A protein has these predicted regions:
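Glycine-rich loop(s) and the adjacent beta-strand/alpha-helix scaffold that form part
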Residues: 137, 146, 150-154, 162-236, ...
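A short acidic-Thr-Gly-centered motif at the start of a beta-strand
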Residues: 130-136, 168-173, 384, 390-400
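Alpha-helix N-cap/helix-initiation motif
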Residues: 22, 123, 169-172, 177, ...
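A glycine-rich dinucleotide-binding beta-alpha-beta segment and adjacent secondary-structure elements
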Residues: 90-95, 106-114, 149-154, 158, ...
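A generic secondary-structure signal for well-formed alpha-helical elements
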Residues: 4, 8, 13, 37-48, ...
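Conserved redox-cofactor binding core of oxidoreductases
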Residues: 14-148, 371-375
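A conserved FAD-binding loop/helix module that cradles the flavin
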Residues: 415-436
Length: 446
């Protein structure tokens, strides 16, 4: 549950233009978003201790919950090693209850965490916080198992609602005075592109061909350290990741941006296979022997590299392939920007340094490679900006072409930081929601 750094909102001003990139500053700043970061941390629930992180932006309050205890063996190995290197390690912020909070119990620290449902409901998200609270008000209705076909508009260019397939695959219409699109970076772009009409033949917000472009994700690079002794990598203290450093998010010589580094989440044996030494046979007795040798003798350090946006990295509608409902599926195109590869390889080398200092016998880097952009944490396809010619939504998330349609998710990110963007998505949602409510109450959206 990371806040972006102040520098992440002004990448173009800090680093200048990058060839073949659409790198730009956000139209808002960290200071604009700080109150909503705090709101997200307290309303959703974040644990940890980020006080030692000297690189973070100003904050008015500490996190609402302390870091999780007890500490794992990896923490005991990695934290002093980072300090010896002159880094500034600290406990990760998590959307997990370290103590009972908001009527739900604390984390049990089991290893089956990432990718699994929480047995104690201690993992925090909208599903067990703001959505249930909204339903209790009886002022909203939650429709599940539905698929939106298009945002409908009238002859004046004003949205009138959405057409959608219900849980029984029947096409229905939901009238609305305000439409908020929050489908994620690929699907929000897809929905706007599918919402074609006489006034908007290329889709909503796409008058200048920006919908779907600037697709970004996070390339995770790092290193695996193999230790002579049993480092209790899997000591059943979940979720695994516990210590991080932000020393390489910015100020890397010759590079724009960077990313956070931390140890990995607990990996089940089937997940660990990809982290065996590269010369390990992929099957047979030798493979089993390597699993026994390395499974509890390794530590992984990696992190999300900030991707450099590019015009050709994009979401489009596939001209041929249709889904179950006959709608065009998403087609992704555009490779990872070369500068992102350089950033990723720099991060991998720094992770290797950390592991060697921690006492690893040998280390293998997991370096960046070319390929399709938009890996984990997709963002950027409905860029926020003040100029309708170079963005899709304004600084308040309103689609430039349609004054009662808002896009509120990671697709509005101008850049995607060197962190998991979930807290930024939540903070932006609180900010946008407040603005929409104020506009409605003032009569501006009626």
């Amino acid at each position: 549950a990371w806040r972006f750094m102040p520098q992440d909102f002004r990448m173009r001003s800090l680093y200048g233009a990058i060839e073949d990139s659409t790198l730009e500053d956000w139209p808002i700043t960290y200071d604009d978003l700080e109150p909503y970061y705090e709101q997200a941390e307290y309303e959703i629930g974040v644990s940890g201790d980020v006080t030692p992180n000297i690189f973070q932006g100003p904050r008015k309050k500490p996190l609402p919950m302390p870091p999780m205890v007890p500490k794992s063996r990896e923490y005991e190995i990695l934290k002093p090693a980072a300090e010896r290197l002159g880094l500034h390690p600290f406990d990760l912020p998590f959307l997990i209850n370290s103590v009972p909070y908001n009527g739900r119990s604390a984390c049990m620290r089991i290893r089956w965490c990432v990718g699994f449902a929480c047995e104690t409901d201690a993992k925090n998200g909208t599903h067990n916080t703001v959505i249930p609270r909204a339903l209790v008000t009886r002022n909203c209705l939650l429709r599940t198992e539905c698929v939106v076909k298009e945002v409908m508009v009238d002859d004046r260019g004003k949205a009138t609602g959405v057409a959608f397939f219900d849980e029984n695959d029947r096409l229905q219409e939901q009238p609305a005075d305000i439409v908020v699109v929050s489908c994620g970076a690929t699907e929000s772009a897809r929905l706007l592109l599918m919402s074609k009409s006489k006034l908007f033949p290329e889709g909503l917000g796409n008058r200048h061909d920006w919908v779907g472009r600037n697709l970004q994700g996070h390339s995770y690079t790092g290193a695996i350290g193999y230790f002579p002794e049993d480092v209790d990598t899997y000591d059943d203290i979940g979720p695994g990741a516990c210590v991080a450093a932000c020393d390489y998010n910015h100020d890397n010589p010759g590079l724009a941006g960077g990313g956070m580094l931390c140890n990995e989440f607990i990996r089940l044996p089937i997940q660990f296979i990809g982290n065996l030494p590269r010369d390990t046979p992929r099957w047979g007795l030798a493979h089993k022997a390597a699993m026994r040798r390395y499974y509890q003798h390794n530590i992984g350090v990696k992190g999300p590299t900030q991707e450099i946006p590019a015009w050709d990295a994009r979401v489009q509608l596939d001209p041929v392939v249709r889904d179950y409902w006959g709608l065009p599926v998403v087609r992704l195109s555009g490779g990872i920007h070369p500068h992102t590869l350089d950033l990723g390889n720099h991060q991998a080398a720094r992770a290797a340094d950390w592991l060697r200092e921690a006492g690893a016998d040998f280390v293998e880097e997991r370096r960046a490679g070319p390929g399709l952009t938009g890996h984990q944490h997709q963002a950027g396809t409905c860029r926020m900006g003040s100029d309708p010619k170079t963005s899709v939504v304004d600084p308040w998330h309103r689609v430039h072409d349609v004054d009662n349609v808002f896009v509120v998710d990671a697709s509005v990110h101008v850049t995607n930081g060197g962190f998991n963007p979930v807290l930024t998505i939540m903070a932006l949602a609180f900010r946008a929601g407040e603005h929409i409510a104020q506009e409605w109450q003032g009569g501006g959206l009626r």
